[in-house]
From Swiss-Prot:
UniProt entry tagged with the keyword Membrane: no
Span list, region Disordered: 131-162
Family, similarity comment: Belongs to the Mediator complex subunit 31 family.
Compartments, as annotated in UniProt: Nucleus
Residue ranges, compositional bias (Basic and acidic residues): 141-162
Domain of life per record: Eukaryota
Biological process, per Gene Ontology: regulation of transcription by RNA polymerase II
Species the sequence originates in: Aspergillus fumigatus (strain ATCC MYA-4609 / CBS 101355 / FGSC A1100 / Af293) (Neosartorya fumigata)
Name under which the protein is recorded: Mediator of RNA polymerase II transcription subunit 31
Main subcellular location of this protein, as a coarse class: nucleus
GO molecular function: transcription coregulator activity
Assembly and interaction partners: Component of the Mediator complex.
Amino acid sequence: MDQQPPVQPQQRPPPSLTNPRFTLELEFVSSLANPYYLSHLAVTYPNLLGISKSSDDSNTSTEGPDPEAQAFAAYLAYLYSYWKTPEYAQFLTHPGATLRALRLLQEESFRRDIIRPQVIEALAGNGLENVQGGQNVEAGDTGHNEGDQGTQQDKENIALKT
């Protein structure tokens, strides 16, 4: 098995519903708006999120981060880099929840914590209201200039509910 990290895609797919790559990525990022899908990812593919399968894996912590987890984190960053733009966000059914999930998934600690039911319930409790701090994503305000303010606010809301 080759240990080189996968090459990150250089180009974004053109925003066209006839482009298979675009529609595949649209379907994936749209599913991230569902906290229970995030839970499914955490339980079914913990290695992708950097979640250790057991606390007995003391050897894995000395080897460094899992290459699959690093590749998935890079892919999530790549997706967030362009889905937050109005050109692409217009295709999202629930842009606020989708972009909130993509933004939170940029944080390693969040990727590890989403296996906890309390975190998923806190996300589900937030619903689609107050997503993106009240910004109107459909009007073109995607929150990509807000820095870490939204991420910190989401973390605080989740911490209060757990």
